[in-house]
Amino acid sequence: MSEDIRRGPGRPPKKRVVPNFERKGILEKPVRPQSRLEFSYDNPLIFKNLFIYFKNLKSKNILVRCTPTEITFFSRDQSQASFVIATIDGKNVNHYYASDVFWLGINRELVEKMFNSIDRSFLKITIVHRYDKPETLFFIFTDFDIDKECTYQITVSEPELDMDLIEMEKSISEERLKNYPLRWEFTSKQLKKTFSDLSNYTELVTIEKLGGDTPLHLYFQKFNSISYHEMYKSSNKINLTSTIPKSQVFQINVKIAHIKSLASAMVTDKIRILCEENGNLIFQSEMDALMLNTITLNNTI
């Protein structure tokens, strides 16, 4: 049977031509003279996924910090146990300009509705904040196939800063991250399954590792009832690394409800998990130019 007969009637699907966007990074001057902020990026779906994450965590208000080098989104989850800090470095996008350091406050539900209407036909997002309209943030989405631009004007405010939330940024500084004694990677599916299964039996789980080349352990034990032990024997399978001295044991107890809600909210396939001695956890994931950090405090147990 010939190839044409196997394919059946009708035209072959039209191949989409994707423009080649240059990533120029940080600009010294804006393209639009009135701009205080200009952000142009050829991956709008990254923003859609970020706001899906905020929605899944039931975040309410989002702080946006613009600096001459990067744009950062800060928020809390509904339980107030987890803090989200998502950063895009200006040098990794098509073009980026911010005149100085300033903050904007946006309502998550309002922006989320806008991103819900964005699909793969839009190949570029441009965000603009202008001196002459300080109460407005412009979102411009471009569909190059039919040369269409969709512009949304979202009302923003000069927010009251959540200093406890902003202070959490110190937990993910480059210097601080080097000193976390334990880190490993899970897929979002692994993370969700492990903590969903555990939640059927217990409220707390112990994370434990001996110093040296030893397995990672997750377990719980209820007196005269039930116990469970999960062991990861091959460190390379989960990219397990630690700085725990050979003679020591690293052990923390974690509230499962906090992790379960995060696991259900995740929008990336791979998650890096870092543990502090005080039991605080950091969940890191990357989406192209976006670095997403979620810090969960153990002292909320």
Curated annotation (Swiss-Prot):
Highest taxon in the source lineage: Viruses
Keywords carried by this UniProt record: Host-virus interaction, Inhibition of host innate immune response by virus, Inhibition of host IRF3 by virus, Inhibition of host RLR pathway by virus, Late protein, Viral immunoevasion
GO annotation terms (biological process): symbiont-mediated suppression of host cytoplasmic pattern recognition receptor signaling pathway via inhibition of IRF3 activity
Induction profile: Expressed in the late phase of the viral replicative cycle.
InterPro entries found in the cross-reference section: DNA_clamp_sf (IPR046938)
Positions in coiled-coil regions: none
Further details from the record: Shares some weak sequence similarity with PCNA (Proliferating cell nuclear antigen).
Name of the protein: Uncharacterized protein E301R
Protein's organism: African swine fever virus (strain Badajoz 1971 Vero-adapted) (Ba71V)
